[in-house]
């Protein structure tokens, strides 16, 4: 009887520790992925800026 109570207490403590330690990890990974996507979009827009300007000038030259 005492062994089962001790076993249950140890199991409950280990489960609680596992949940507390594992909880923040996925949240931060999700935000880091979102941040990385935002940085890639920003960098793509910055790199595409001169090309868009050249295309705009070319269309104006073509229109006359």
From Swiss-Prot:
Modifications made to the protein after synthesis: A protein with the same sequence as cecropin A, but lacking the carboxyl blocking group, has been isolated and called cecropin C.
One Pfam family in the UniProt entry: Cecropin
Residue ranges the record assigns to the propeptide: 23-26
Naturally occurring in which organism (per UniProt): Hyalophora cecropia (Cecropia moth)
Known role: Cecropins have lytic and antibacterial activity against several Gram-positive and Gram-negative bacteria.
The name this protein goes by in its record: Cecropin-A
Residue ranges of the TM segments: none
One GO term describing the cellular component: extracellular region
GO terms (BP aspect): antibacterial humoral response; defense response to Gram-positive bacterium; innate immune response
Compartments where located: Secreted
């Amino acid at each position: 009887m005492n062994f089962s109570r001790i076993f249950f207490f140890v199991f409950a403590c280990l489960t609680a520790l596992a949940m507390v330690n594992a909880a923040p990890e996925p949240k931060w990974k999700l935000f880091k992925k979102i941040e990385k996507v935002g940085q890639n979009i920003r960098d793509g827009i910055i790199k595409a800026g001169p090309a868009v300007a050249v295309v705009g000038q070319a269309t104006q030259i073509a229109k006359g």
